[in-house]
Amino acid sequence: MEKVLVIVGPTAVGKTALSIALAKKFNGEIISGDSMQVYRSLDIGTAKVTETEKEGIPHYLIDCREVSETYSAADFQKEGRQKIKEITEKGKLPIIVGGTGLYIQSLLYDFQLGSREIDDSPEIRETYNLFAEEKGNQALWLLLQQKDPLAANSIHFNNRKKVIRALEVFDKTGYSILTPKEKPARLYDYYLLGLETDRALLYERINQRVDQMMTEGLLEEAKQMFQQPHAQAAQGIGYKEFFPYFSGEQSLEMAVETVKQQSRRYAKRQLTWFRNRMAAHWWNLVQQPTDLPKLEKEVAEWLQQKESE
């Protein structure tokens, strides 16, 4: 079973810097586990690692899709597993870094995405089809997001067939279409590091990051996505919040505040996901940076162990 180091946590908590430090120390290469960093030209709003920050460490699953293309958890699962294999075969340590919980969970476990088998229900499908015809695909997808956010986050809102199937499964079973019937098997000997910090401090860091993004040109990236509003990438935080401003319906100041608010809410959801669904070793390096040697020691001990039982 291949060893994989995984670094998770909310936005603006220092995952990138830690991943570079550990890659240098343990001969690692990095796989991005972020659903938005796959898109070319969306660098600022996705907080993509810069060439300078990489310090020569190879990074994968970044800049591998055009903004007009879709990208799903199933895509990440397939491509991520291939990269783990390639990195391991080079004698290096695969390091997964990111904040998209479903992506990382589907990669580490034998998670059969979208495979829950139930009988078709034409009546339910017809009801939702009529709803979509009247209200639109976006409204249908938002309905799924309310009922089953796990599935909604893995399906593009314009894929009406998949959205309806997910709603159908949830209505008939009470479970997400992504919920396996049995506990999925673990595919890797992984060590999961979680980064967190005081909530007030985290929110302050998020606000500062958004201000810095604005200085670096976030508005231009958002304008690019405003011209492609139906693209999956346009739904990312930091882009769609500016659409009312571009339409003349809202001030720039209010749009920026909305980005900050949505980013804070997303960070809260990220923390909830990882705490509830994945058993991580949690560290607060923002407030306790001197804990880094202790963290590195634990990783070194894990690497020396034989395959985990």
From Swiss-Prot:
Annotated positions for site Interaction with substrate tRNA: 100, 125
Disulfide-bonded cysteines: none
Function: Catalyzes the transfer of a dimethylallyl group onto the adenine at position 37 in tRNAs that read codons beginning with uridine, leading to the formation of N6-(dimethylallyl)adenosine (i(6)A).
Listed cofactors: Mg(2+)
Reaction(s) catalysed (UniProt annotation): adenosine(37) in tRNA + dimethylallyl diphosphate = N(6)-dimethylallyladenosine(37) in tRNA + diphosphate
Highest taxon of source: Bacteria
Binding residue positions for substrate: 11-16
Similarity comment text for this entry: Belongs to the IPP transferase family.
Organism annotation: Enterococcus faecalis (strain ATCC 700802 / V583)
An example Gene Ontology molecular-function term: ATP binding
Keyword Disulfide bond: no
Protein name (record): tRNA dimethylallyltransferase
Gene3D superfamilies: 1.10.20.140, P-loop containing nucleotide triphosphate hydrolases
Known partners and oligomeric status: Monomer.
Binding-site list for ATP: 9-16
Keywords attached to this entry: ATP-binding, Magnesium, Nucleotide-binding, Transferase, tRNA processing
Keyword Zinc listed: no
Region called Interaction with substrate tRNA, residue ranges: 34-37
Gene name linked to the record: miaA
Pfam families tied to this protein: IPPT
Entry EC no(s): 2.5.1.75
Family matches, as NCBIfam families: miaA
GO BP: tRNA modification
PANTHER family: TRNA DIMETHYLALLYLTRANSFERASE (PTHR11088:SF60)
